[in-house]
Amino acid sequence: MSVITVERIKLFSTRSPWWCMVIAAFLTVGFAALTTGFLNATDEPQATIFITQPGAQLSQMVMMVMAALAVTTEYRFGTIRTSFQAVPQRAALLLGKTAVVAFLAGIVGLIASFGAWGIGSLFAGNADLAINTGAEWRLLAGQGLIFALSAVIAVAVGILIRQSAGAIAILILWPLLVENLVTLIPKVGDDLAKWAPFANGSSFLNQGQDFGLAGAGAGGSDFALGPWWALLYFAGWAAALMLIALFTASKRDA
């Protein structure tokens, strides 16, 4: 069997990936139903496609946790040693694992985003939630790319940390807290924050969106890069972290 086939079987041999996928999809779709349903109940016409995606970041966090656990669980129970014995080329094994997890995360991201848009359209009443612009397609279809790249980052962090609690803490605090705290640095904080990796991932999705009731600044109004350059920058972070993780894994004991 190929490395990817083995990694797929290993991933789905436990319940946690299934639970993570269900929770990720439920969060995005559930929040879409709540927000658009509330706007419809108040006869508010300002529901937009952006309003259907409030749960996307939480779902992204859930899939990052799943990706990290795919690695750290093997280190925890020592099964990674057996895997390395079966596939002496550690980079090939870890890249296979990364490919499986990233592909799965990307699919979940697409299902969650378009599912949220579909449910939001049902609950939004008279609001026009038709996908009319390239920016709106980018917001929905782009979730798959962002989820996949986030999973790559999560696997890399899992390889580097090797401990579940530590890896999960980093992956949750990094986008939700650390990148926001950067803005508090005197004089240069705002400029540095524009180059934060997850901020650029959000920038790729949010540029050109109609934020509706969320306000013009909901997705950030001052971007350092255009949307596709922001995606490339985010992908560069994912690739760099993965290269560091692969180098580290090749040099230390399992």
Where in this protein do the model-derived segments appear?
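Secretory targeting signals
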Residues: 17-68, 94-162, 176-189, 202-236, ...
